[in-house]
Structure formats: C-alpha cells, structure tokens
C-alpha cells in the first residue's frame, strides 16, 4: 500500500475483529480497506516529539535522548536543572554522600541514601535507593526500597524488564 502510518491508534471495538491475531499490518489489514470502501475516519498529525516505546531497548534509548537533550521533549516533567545539569525535584531526598552522574532525573518521591549512586541516564521516582546501591541507564518507579545494582532496566511497581543487550 502507498500509506505510511505510525503512532497511537484509538479504535472502535468492532475494528479489532479485522486485525489478524498473527503478525499483521494496520494499514494493509484495516485502514487500506476502509479507505478503498470510502469509510471516513479521523486522524491527527502531530509535529511534536514522538518515539516508539515498544520494548525496553527503545524505552531506555528514548530516556537517554530526552535526558541528554531535554528540549527535545518539551512536555517532559523536568524541574529546572541544577548546577550539575541534573533534574532533581524539590521534594526528592538526596543524602550528602550520595552521588549523581549527569544526567539524572529524581522525582518528588525519590530518595538516595548514603553512598548510593545514580546515573548516567537514570530516572527515579517512588523509590528509595539504599546505601551503596547503584542505578544507571535505568528507569525505576514505584519500587519502594531497593538495594544492589540496577542497570539497563525498567523497574515499575515490582516488575523488572531488562534491555536485550544487558547482562544479568
């Protein structure tokens, strides 16, 4: 087909029956036939930041891009960067012996205890990083108290997904 279409699809439930359970193509299997049948549907063009976040590798790569260049995604909920160019929310708790390696985002519910380290490319909120723990190239959210090494992963509310090239 001549169409190129990506992004978020909001579908009526009856359209789901037209999508093959096996690997399929939204344009070829759903939108192309609809256009050929003269069916009208709405679309929206967005010139702002967009990224595929389909798997941990893409999610972490996008996190890295946004932390490295915050102007890329102007809707990112970053506070003003501090003098080290890290993004630390006012309510975040950072022990004076904790270390940050730029760039890092610490949300309002983030705590780094003594000798903990975060960064580069770490996003932490809703989590306490225990003494001597490390977080790098990772997104840690809603994990409560954590210890040890957290690298090349996304950890949310008790679930952890590792990047495909990360060693366990």
Predicted regions and their residues:
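Short, flexible loop/turn segments with low-complexity composition
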Residues: 72-83
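Catalytic-core segments of class I nucleotidyltransferases/pyrophosphorylases
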Residues: 1-74
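Structural signal for interior beta-strand "rungs" in well-ordered beta-sheet cores
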Residues: 81-168
